């Protein structure tokens, strides 16, 4: 099974390279432009998609201007099944997005593989209303196979200024066994992480080419990194309180 899973995942990544690279580069350019103008990069996902927002937050080799919107009832640790129920509620996003410090010039990255549930769609639209540029990471194939649960009939892909397709199959899982009817082994976390890291790599290279110093963290386990990292925390802590919370 390991060979099958890795083979399929590699093919998905190759498809992303072949078909989505221009969108990734465009997204990277917008991220660079935002950071060069004191913007913040917000990310949101429900359920397992929220994992990707934490993958790029306070990350060694990653950008400091990253703000994951972590609404705990929509994560997993306060009730996994309950989070799925909430994700399907129209207008629920208004209960937490109203207080988010999203400004014109910021970037909002919204992740949902199915792209059918109301909360990610509403998050994208509220962020746009606040002036953010919206980047969506979703599966166009999966999304097209399912009816939208949003009252407008929209899917997440309808809300993005840039839409990047992670290529996930319907249901996300890619493996099957002859003696088992349910597909297993999802791919969207792997492809999502690659897409995000590629966007930010493009952004960092763009900033370097613009003679702008990218705000990149050094691993805290490398000697003499602490002062560098603390300066970045201090720089962004007002906009991203999660960076310095509880210190």
Curated annotation (Swiss-Prot):
> Pfam families this protein is in?
SIS_2 (PF13580)
Q: Which Gene3D superfamilies does the protein's record reference? A: Glucose-6-phosphate isomerase like protein, domain 1 (3.40.50.10490)
GO molecular function of the protein, one example? carbohydrate derivative binding
Superkingdom of source: Bacteria
Tell me where in this chain the SIS domain is found.
Answer: 31-214
Annotated InterPro entries: RpiR-like_SIS, SIS_dom, SIS_dom_sf, SIS_GmhA/DiaA_subfam, UPF0309
Q: Name one GO biological process term.
A: carbohydrate derivative metabolic process
UniProt family annotation: Belongs to the UPF0309 family.
Protein name per Swiss-Prot or TrEMBL: UPF0309 protein LMOf2365_2617
* Species, as recorded: Listeria monocytogenes serotype 4b (strain F2365)
